[in-house]
Amino acid sequence: VPSDSTVSLAKLTATGTKSSSTFLRGDNTFAEAGGGMTLINATSGSSNVTSITVDNVFTSTYDFYKIFMSFRVSNNAGYYLRYIKADGSDRTSDYINLDGRLIQNGTFEDNGASGPVSTFYFGRNSGSDISSLQSSHEFTVFNPFLSSTQSTITNDGVGYHDGINNYLKIIQANINTNVESHRGFKIVANSGNFNPYSIKVFGVTNA
């Protein structure tokens, strides 16, 4: 044994798999690090599309998900989300929306609650008269894959309100009251096109 009481790894017989994603525990086993997020899907484009489909991202592997998205929409169009059900069809009903917006001029636009309706409407527009602005959103999605619970989303977003001509902070929650499994989602423009767009989906690692 060296004078500093250390033992080289070469002299240890550890169980498990040594890799860049594991660490050596005190009981001499290699294990995956807990916590953090795992990138599941990255979707982006720079040509006109009227909708963006992100399918087969919700599974039994994760309970919670983070979705980051940024895009521009032509025609000052609003946009909405629909879940993709386990059979591949769109969920077109039973969305309850809770909606508030903090406007740059200091006012708070309380849009209250709406629903049940056919979509989760989450964006006014991207401020198409401001060429450098994109609408950006961070979704937290809870239990979308479970067939025994309602799927819920919170939205923390920023964009532009063309009717008021001011930037806005978007604060939302959405509940789909159908108790069913969802495997993905679709973002759809009311009119016009998305271009450019970028969406990344992460699974929150179960402890």
What is the meaning of each model-derived region?
Residues 1-44:
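Fibrous stalk/shaft segments of extracellular and virion attachment machinery
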Residues 34-207:
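Surface-exposed molecular-recognition determinants
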